């Protein structure tokens, strides 16, 4: 049955939850568990559960916000355009690093899922987590995954990279700005780009191209991978 809830309901809930997350993140001086996106997701779930609202009632307006995911992803091209000279010079190294990273992500998720005995539907939901939400959700649906789990996996993955990405790079002594950006974008998509922006223009540009290429590689690789794990 179609929801009769006004579209403003989902929009207002999302904005308030995100606003609370922003305030918590600011006042906690950047504590990673208070990343606005993660806080908004948790608060949204709690609100719907406590208020006994259905997801369909929320999503009447929530899907209007989701509509802007794809345009937001395209906006990653802006910092990339500013560093197009480096892209031309190192295009092969950049492309190969992202492709290998993307494939490794899918393989590692599969191995871990099998090792801990995850249900097939849950495993399929986790496989596209390296891509942005706009790309990961359709892939998840097409391979029999659960979009809600995929969304959580994508966001949680990004939160970890946002919180610990810089520390990992320092620990493993990754100093080249191109390598830093590629690592952040490949592992953490949008929030990885956010960390790259904090580091510099080169890191931001490389993280942006990584997000885009990872999405393309994920779309191609996962359907090819599925017959071998079915």
Curated annotation (Swiss-Prot):
GO biological process, one term: killing of cells of another organism
Keyword annotations of the record: Cell membrane, Cytolysis, Membrane, Transmembrane, Transmembrane helix
InterPro entries referenced in this protein's UniProt entry, alphabetically: Antiholin-like_LrgB, CidB/LrgB
First-listed, main subcellular location of the protein, grouped into a coarse class: membrane
Transmembrane segments: 5-25, 30-50, 61-81, 92-112, 126-146, 149-169, 177-197, 209-229
Domain of life: Bacteria
Gene Ontology CC terms: plasma membrane
Protein's cellular compartments: Cell membrane
Membrane topology: Multi-pass membrane protein
Functional description taken from the UniProt entry: Inhibits the expression or activity of extracellular murein hydrolases by interacting, possibly with LrgA, with the holin-like protein CidA. The LrgAB and CidA proteins may affect the proton motive force of the membrane. May be involved in programmed cell death (PCD), possibly triggering PCD in response to antibiotics and environmental stresses.
PANTHER family for the chain: PLASTIDAL GLYCOLATE_GLYCERATE TRANSLOCATOR 1, CHLOROPLASTIC, PUTATIVE SEROTONIN TRANSPORTER
Family: Belongs to the CidB/LrgB family. LrgB subfamily.
Protein name, UniProt field: Antiholin-like protein LrgB
Organism: Bacillus mycoides (strain KBAB4) (Bacillus weihenstephanensis)
């Amino acid at each position: 049955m179609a929801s009769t809830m006004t579209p403003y309901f989902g929009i207002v809930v999302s904005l308030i939850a995100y606003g609370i997350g922003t305030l918590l993140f600011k006042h906690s001086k950047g504590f990673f568990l208070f990343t606005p996106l993660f806080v908004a997701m948790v608060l949204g779930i709690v609100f719907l559960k406590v208020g006994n609202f259905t997801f369909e009632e929320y999503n009447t307006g929530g899907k209007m916000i989701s509509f802007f995911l794809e345009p937001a992803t395209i906006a990653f091209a802006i910092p990339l355009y500013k560093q197009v000279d480096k892209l031309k010079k190192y295009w092969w190294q950049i492309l190969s690093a992202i492709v290998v990273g993307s494939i490794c992500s899918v393989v590692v998720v599969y191995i871990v899922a099998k090792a801990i005995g995850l249900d097939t539907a849950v495993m399929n939901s986790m496989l596209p987590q390296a891509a942005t939400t706009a790309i990961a959700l359709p892939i998840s649906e097409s391979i029999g995954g659960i979009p809600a789990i995929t969304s959580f996996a994508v966001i949680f993955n990004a939160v970890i990279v946002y919180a610990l990405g810089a520390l990992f790079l320092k620990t493993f002594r990754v100093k080249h700005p191109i390598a830093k950006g590629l690592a952040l974008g490949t592992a953490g998509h949008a929030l990885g780009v956010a960390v790259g922006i904090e580091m510099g223009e080169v890191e931001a540009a490389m993280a942006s191209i990584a997000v885009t290429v990872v999405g393309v590689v994920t779309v191609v690789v996962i359907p090819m991978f599925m017959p071998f794990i079915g």
